[in-house]
From Swiss-Prot:
Catalytic activities: (6R)-L-erythro-5,6,7,8-tetrahydrobiopterin(out) + a dicarboxylate(in) = (6R)-L-erythro-5,6,7,8-tetrahydrobiopterin(in) + a dicarboxylate(out); L-erythro-7,8-dihydrobiopterin(out) + a dicarboxylate(in) = L-erythro-7,8-dihydrobiopterin(in) + a dicarboxylate(out); L-sepiapterin(out) + a dicarboxylate(in) = L-sepiapterin(in) + a dicarboxylate(out); prostaglandin F2alpha(out) + a dicarboxylate(in) = prostaglandin F2alpha(in) + a dicarboxylate(out)
Species per Swiss-Prot/TrEMBL record: Sus scrofa (Pig)
GO biological process: alpha-ketoglutarate transport; organic anion transport; prostaglandin transport; renal tubular secretion
Protein name as it appears in the record: Solute carrier family 22 member 6
A single GO molecular function term of this UniProt record: prostaglandin transmembrane transporter activity
Family: Belongs to the major facilitator (TC 2.A.1) superfamily. Organic cation transporter (TC 2.A.1.19) family.
Protein's UniProt keywords contain Heme: no
Membrane-crossing residue ranges in chain numbering: 10-30, 136-156, 165-185, 196-216, 225-245, 249-269, 338-358, 369-389, 396-416, 424-444, 457-477, 485-505
Pfam families noted in UniProt: Sugar_tr (PF00083)
Glycosylation-annotated residues: N39, N56, N92
Ranges in the topological domain labelled Cytoplasmic: 1-9, 157-164, 217-224, 270-337, 390-395, 445-456, 506-547
NCBIfam families on file: 2A0119
Region named Disordered: 511-547
Comment, domains: Multiple cysteine residues are necessary for proper targeting to the plasma membrane.
Length: 547
């Protein structure tokens, strides 16, 4: 009897699985909000230099006198005249023709309070020469996500999924709330970094805890459900940000609920598969019996014993318990191949994804509308991805999603700038494909790695994804060399990465591997199957020729 049979014996997808999966994925609604929160909390409203305070002129006259105009006739954002220019006679009785010298803003800025009455940009003047600090805040958040993926991926293998998840909920609640009260920009960045760390841990432990409590035939459904909840969170962010335009209130609103998640997470049941892989057979038995009781399978739970578990989980009990570090991924050729290929897939997906979703103001339409559209496209994209995952397999779904996303982005690079509808449609389609790719890669990675390094593998994959999200904003700076250069790079990377899926095995309908030997055996079985198919094809060729 394998572990999957034990899950079926205690109820399969019963009341426990339904309740725990719901409670575990609920925080993902707000995790999506945190990842793209800076689209709203760091939005840049229209702005211009503040004229000198002692001019005694009306506002319109001040703008005419002190501010040069850009190519579209609007007041310049970052420059002002060194002395008052054209217009009616000024207090000193002079007037000029508007050709005076300019200088950077020296008295601060005036911001248009219409759409964004309060953001970190308006509060700390992150414009003009300080504009790069806005991107720094998002990059530091992604650095936190990278650190969290490495640290909490390792801790989840050593301490368990449940303990790490509880810690991450508390850290997100505290750091997110403190960020809302940050007195200055450095303190804000520090708390955002801590939030990124904990949210990475939540993402990894959420997927692993759910997958390890679900039977084989339902794992794809759970992975797709998690993806849909994340997409729903993007809808939620658009509505909440529209209703709560002030950044401190918005930051608070998406952080305080994690205190509630922290409280109810104490009632989660630790993964019995992790217990068994850690050699804690007594706790494995207690966890399975508790789940059987919740699922109404008391007799089946009572029939379980230490002897039954020893016979059923012999492989897990004989595994090497001491190795769960990242170096284990490079220890043998089969794991090394998995690690390198999956790392490329994680990097490419995140790199292209954040290249699109973190520049919503660049579309020239309502930022709230674009946020809703980007969330809406995930629904059909992930549905199609789910159907492909369950019918054709994980490998073709992963390859197709990355390839199509890259092609859409590359085409967007050659579409004229004035074709805004076409460019937006291609960006939305590409974003949908990347969302489907994220959905698949989480599930695919969890199914490829053996139990004792599964969380480490997910952590390292997420680490490479975060590297992609950190590098992505830097690539946008190449637009100064050529406007479409970022799109060409964002598109070429996923197209190239899609080829790596050809080196990965298919996991559709396969049990989760518990040991490295299981991974090697799976690869040998697939090689034998491919060899048999090739021999059958060779045998069919002479028959067709003779016919």
């Amino acid at each position: 009897m394998a572990f999957n049979d034990l899950l079926l014996q205690v109820g399969g997808v019963g009341r426990f699985q339904q309740i725990q999966v719901t409670l575990v994925v609920l925080p993902l609604l707000l995790m999506a909000s945190h990842n793209t929160l800076q689209n709203f909390t760091a939005a840049i409203p229209a702005h211009h230099c503040r004229p000198p305070a002692d001019t005694n002129l009306s506002r319109d006259t001040e703008l005419e006198a002190w501010l040069p105009r850009d190519g579209q006739g609007r007041p310049a954002s970052c420059l002002r005249f060194t002395s008052p220019q054209r217009g009616p006679p000024f207090p000193n009785g002079t007037g000029t023709n508007g050709t005076g010298t300019t200088e950077p803003c020296t008295n601060g800025w005036i911001y248009d309070p219409g759409t964004f009455p309060s953001t970190i940009v308006t509060e700390w003047d992150l414009v003009c020469s300080r504009r790069a600090l806005r991107q720094l805040a998002q990059s530091l958040y992604m650095v936190g996500v990278l650190l969290g993926a490495m640290i909490f991926g390792y801790l989840a293998n050593r301490l368990g999924r449940r303990k790490v998840l509880i810690l991450n909920y508390l850290q997100t609640a505290v750091s997110g709330t403190c960020a809302a009260f940050a007195p200055n920009f450095p303190v804000y960045c520090a708390f955002r970094l801590l939030s990124g760390m904990s949210l990475a841990g939540i993402s990894l432990s959420c997927m692993t805890l759910n997958v390890e409590w679900m039977p084989i035939h339902t794992r794809a459904c759970v992975g797709t459900l998690i993806g849909y909840v994340y997409s729903l969170g993007q809808f939620l962010l658009a509505g909440v940000a529209y209703a709560v335009p002030r950044w401190r209130h918005l930051q608070m609103l998406v952080s305080v609920p994690f205190f509630a998640f922290f409280i109810y997470s104490w009632f989660f049941i630790e993964s019995a598969r992790w217990y068994s892989s850690s050699g804690r057979l007594d706790l494995t038995l207690k966890a399975l019996q508790r789940v059987a009781w919740i699922n109404g399978k008391r007799e089946e739970g009572a029939s379980l014993s230490m002897e039954v578990l020893r016979a059923s989980l012999n492989k897990e009990l004989t595994m090497d318990k001491g190795q769960a570090s990242a170096m284990e991924l490079l220890r043998c050729p089969v794991l090394r191949r998995l690690f390198l290929c999956l790392s490329l897939l994680w990097f490419a997906t995140s790199f292209a994804y954040y290249g699109l979703v973190m520049d919503l103001q660049g579309f020239g339409v309502s930022i709230y509308l674009i946020q809703v559209i980007f969330g809406a496209v995930d629904l059909p994209a992930k549905l199609v991805g789910f159907l492909v995952i369950n019918t054709m397999g994980r490998r073709p779904a992963q390859m197709a999603s990355l390839l199509l996303a890259g092609i859409c982005i590359l085409i967007n690079g050659v579409v004229p700038q004035d074709q805004s509808i076409v460019r937006t449609a291609l960006a939305v389609l590409g974003k949908g494909c990347l969302a489907a790719s994220f959905n698949c890669i989480f599930l695919y990675t969890g199914e490829l790695y053996p139990t004792m390094i599964r969380q480490t593998g997910l952590g390292m994959g997420s680490t490479l994804a975060r590297v992609g999200s950190i590098v992505s904003p830097l690539v946008s700076m190449t637009a100064e060399l050529y406007p479409s250069m970022p799109l060409f790079i964002y598109g070429a990377v996923p197209v190239a990465a899609s080829a790596a899926t050809a080196l990965l095995p298919e996991t559709l309908g396969q049990p989760l591997p518990d040991t490295v030997q299981d991974v090697e055996s799976r690869r040998k079985r697939q090689r034998r199957r491919q060899k048999q198919q090739q021999e059958q094809q060779k045998q069919m060729v002479p028959l067709q020729a003779s016919a």
